[in-house]
């Protein structure tokens, strides 16, 4: 776990420094790293780990309740941001999106593999693809379209992109349909080596994007803690795992990786949605910084204690 924390810190700092030192090249490199993750590294990890998943009762129930919990988190974020705090429209949308989207791939996969093991990673991949994937493609894009200041693509285009231009969904479907012979043990082991590449690439991109937003005047580093970010900290890190625990209490056999992934910090995808629809990027960027810092500090404390 110490190496996970170190990788997060070092990768983010390299991204920050690179963007400040070579702004054009670093920005391009950060986007290429996200493309590499999306189209090259994550699909085979998802495929080979889903081939061997067995959907016993606890898995299916956990997935259904995970979707319900995410929906309730989004609703709670809306209640706090809109009727209660009366935040500006684009800020409220950023709060809701940042509450919905977890960093379950870049940070979640390595943490599940390190803390729990390979079998739990396979079940965690299912949760990530189905629960967090639906949260991104359906919930977050819908919120962006409803609250953003810029006109996004229409609903029909988003649906087509979800089904036909989503390599993670394609890999998931193929993995669920494929026979076990297509994912022998050595290939599963190799996929877990690829997991080690996710975090440095992902957090390099986070650091570069944050520095880019600072250069553009969107945020200041270190960011100031303000009310919208406090809401995200509560909904993402407290309410999300808390609701899943509460909803699953009557049931047994829920994979433990579900709870860990439900407690992951705000994902970089919140900034992607914010860019696309004109949400407040300061809020999304600061939510990433603060929620990730809290989770990393908690992990570091766990490492020191154990």
Predicted regions and their residues:
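Alpha-helical transmembrane segments of multi-pass small-molecule/ion transporters
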Residues: 1-306
